[in-house]
């Protein structure tokens, strides 16, 4: 096709072009609702420069899409686009230009006026191309093949960068139609929705979109003619690099096996008899030109999604735009490709991509939120030291300050462990006579994400505050506080306290009080938003880097859904990440609010215990 691109690295060029082509499709969506098959065929024709045939009923936006190209491509004007609807009565002059009478009168010889006709067009569109007369058709064949025409002995080079044609149907029994059909390297079949009763929802949805859309939307020019030229150089390099790689041979064998299976399904069709059966009737024929166009179309699909080389899925989608030759063969190819595609994608869904990401959001995300908040403890050492100075150096509190400083990391470590943690503590209860007793040992488990564990811990501590509230007198309350001061909370792995940690009850209250105080002095919503966004972006990055062969399919998702083909699992994971992140922001905010409310009560208990010991020591 073209020379090797220079300047930026190939990967950077691909990312830049992929972004622009994605924007181009978005712009076209503003003016044409649905019709993703048409848009994709037009896009592939523009990228590759391959002549492209659009086959479909009237009113499926074939002409409209071509006429929209100047609105989205910088450097392409309306006058650069030649659109004509032909019939068997169309005169060659309506396509190739009219004689310049003035030059003949002036004795300057014969010439054509080509402004506004095919010879001056950068983009050409011939509607109902199979209705052309033989006289017009022979000239068109050369215009498509060689980008040249000869009119009255004058050789004219054609400047078109994209050549499109449209038809309602293809007559495979007409040799002349077959010759013309073979020149179109890309063929898009645009089928309207069959069986209205079976597609009520889709029809209603599309109608709503059409009726609510702006009649003349303002489109942006998001790509340039230079970008189109650069694309073809990049495609050359992508194809060249791919065929120099080790995986190319195995991948092509896999693709050709699918092609063989499809052609076997076509054996009783007109398409096979007219187009794919070789001169030796025992063999199926696929031309070198057809194999070449398949590689470039697959590379184009890969480029649009930002990949540096085509994959099996790119080739499968490319077959839909290169293999069928009429509506009947398209339906067979589409169904076979859909089955093979969904089988391949289902295999990818079994990978751990989605699970890993959702686990990340469910667990690691909240762990990071807690760790970020817990790091604020470091700024509270002065508060801890000041607290320690206020408390008399009497048993059991002589080590309160250093115990708290050393306990904080351990408390955070246990709360942020991914697995559940067990605990044991002695219960304080009030008997029927009103006497407060330290009763049996209570054991339990804190599970869930770190904030859920903290929430459960606060509920546990809340039960002791309720016991305090049931005290009948200040003296009884002091007695209870002294009893609480002797309690120790044991943390450990589930069902075992091996490698566990003992935390004095009061130290635990101090730690929670500091945590709640820090939350109160922090813009919690901002912290949550930052943590969620960081985690989401890291997840999106890791999932894309981990599976490049199934990344970037967002741009083709509507087309895949139109054909009944599953969107690769990586895209579904990304969607779930976005949805999960939104939900997590809200859930985190609610959880922190609940923790703050519960924490306030724990702080009151901690404050009362501190004041009690200060008063006892004075």
UniProtKB/Swiss-Prot annotation:
| Native species | Acidianus two-tailed virus
- Can you list the GO cellular component terms from the UniProt entry? virion component
Q: PANTHER family per the record?
A: ATPASE RAVA
Q: Which UniProt keywords apply?
A: Coiled coil, Virion
Which branch of life, at top level?
Viruses
Identify the Gene3D superfamilies for this entry.
P-loop containing nucleotide triphosphate hydrolases (3.40.50.300)
Alphabetical list of Pfam families matching this protein? bpMoxR
Q: Which residues form a coiled coil?
A: 570-598
List the subcellular locations: Virion
Name of the protein in question: Structural protein ORF618
